[in-house]
Amino acid sequence: MTALSQSEPSLSASSDSSTDALVQKAKRHLLQNYKQPPFVLARGQGARVWDMDGREYLDLIGGIATCALGHCHPEVVAAAKAQLDSLWHVSNVFYSQPQIDLAAQLTEWSGLSRAFFCNSGAEANEALLKLTRKVMKDRGTPERFEVISFDSSFHGRTLATVTATGQAKYQKGFEPLPAGFTHVPYGDLEAVRKAVGPATAAILVEPIQGEGGVRMAPLGFLVGLRALCDEHGLLLLVDEVQTGMGRTGKPFGFMHEGIVPDGISVAKALGNGLPIGAMLCKEELGASLTPGTHGSTFGGNPVAAAAANAVVRILRRPGFLDEVQEKGAYLLARARELQGRLPAGRIQAVRGQGLLVGVQLDHKVAPVIAQVHEEGLLVNPAGDRTMLFAPPFIVTVRELD
């Protein structure tokens, strides 16, 4: 064993860490299922990141609405480091305090009663879908299994969640898709009403369609969905993966309409970059997921949960989310000023709430995004013609300018 380990070459010692070499190495070894710009990010602090060559970028996408407190937030770093020094992982066959504390924080903050932890938004949405099936069986109505979701929605990349997603481009090549999903126009309450049938079990909705172009439903849409679900005995499931954790200026997007969903999915900003997701639900629904019905080896991992506890504590501080609303209003105003200065129609729409803003152009955004990368700004597309801005909440007004 000793001789073998001594004879093994040191990959790190012999590797070329230049940008070009790393990009070529990535192309040799990684699946080529992402389109990435030709630079390698190396470190971050606050709302800024630096690449391997030392070039600085203002991060206006925050890991796709994930690094809500910016990069290397000192309180989150301290929480994760302290947990690394005590306990990394035990799986969910044992209790761990960070997970218990996080469940208590999230249920109190959301108004829901039970938490299940996983590792991503897709897994959280899978949990919602499985919960729906199990609840309907426990109610004695197993024939009710269909979920209504919406055109242009996005709920994840697993086979079930990509089927729930209302965008054919993400489903292409993965047919046959699982049965049990119906898509209707977003914001059209009458279309939802017509789609409800004997097999309908739930409605799955995003308060704002982030990946669908930062599309906002008419005010009152969620209220209407809640009433429709109550009328027909359906579950109202709200995907808060992108809109939750304060992104819209309230703890969760559904709170803008004053409703209480049956279940929600949370991820992205929950761990500020560490992988963690959660499904939160009402007490009576959570009773359906008994031991053995669902699980996750890594879900609610002590280190990720410790970081998430720090995130939630910070977000819950008095006045913190008020600042998110103020900065969001400022970003929207500045984007609309730019819209007014450019030739008519160049910017077709500016949409958003809080620090989730979409700027829709009259042409494809890919060349524009490549250009702003060169200028030291990180943004992302939300559809072919919309640029998504989801900066860290700690971004300053000066940085937004």
From Swiss-Prot:
Pfam families: Aminotran_3. PROSITE patterns: AA_TRANSFER_CLASS_3 (PS00600). Binds 1 pyridoxal phosphate per subunit. Keywords: Amino-acid biosynthesis, Aminotransferase, Arginine biosynthesis, Cytoplasm, Pyridoxal phosphate, Transferase. Belongs to the class-III pyridoxal-phosphate-dependent aminotransferase family. ArgD subfamily. Pathway: Amino-acid biosynthesis; L-arginine biosynthesis; N(2)-acetyl-L-ornithine from L-glutamate: step 4/4. It catalyses: N(2)-acetyl-L-ornithine + 2-oxoglutarate = N-acetyl-L-glutamate 5-semialdehyde + L-glutamate. Homodimer. N(2)-acetyl-L-ornithine binds at R157, S296. GO terms for molecular function: identical protein binding; N2-acetyl-L-ornithine:2-oxoglutarate 5-aminotransferase activity; pyridoxal phosphate binding. GO terms for biological process: L-arginine biosynthetic process. Its cofactor is pyridoxal 5'-phosphate. It is found in: Cytoplasm. GO terms for cellular component: cytoplasm. This is Acetylornithine aminotransferase. The modification N6-(pyridoxal phosphate)lysine is found at K268. It comes from Myxococcus xanthus. The gene is argD. Its EC number is 2.6.1.11. Pyridoxal 5'-phosphate binds at G121, A122, F154, D239, E240, V241, Q242, T297. May also have succinyldiaminopimelate aminotransferase activity, thus carrying out the corresponding step in lysine biosynthesis. Gene3D superfamilies: Aspartate Aminotransferase, domain 1, Type I PLP-dependent aspartate aminotransferase-like (Major domain). It is an enzyme of class 2 (transferase).
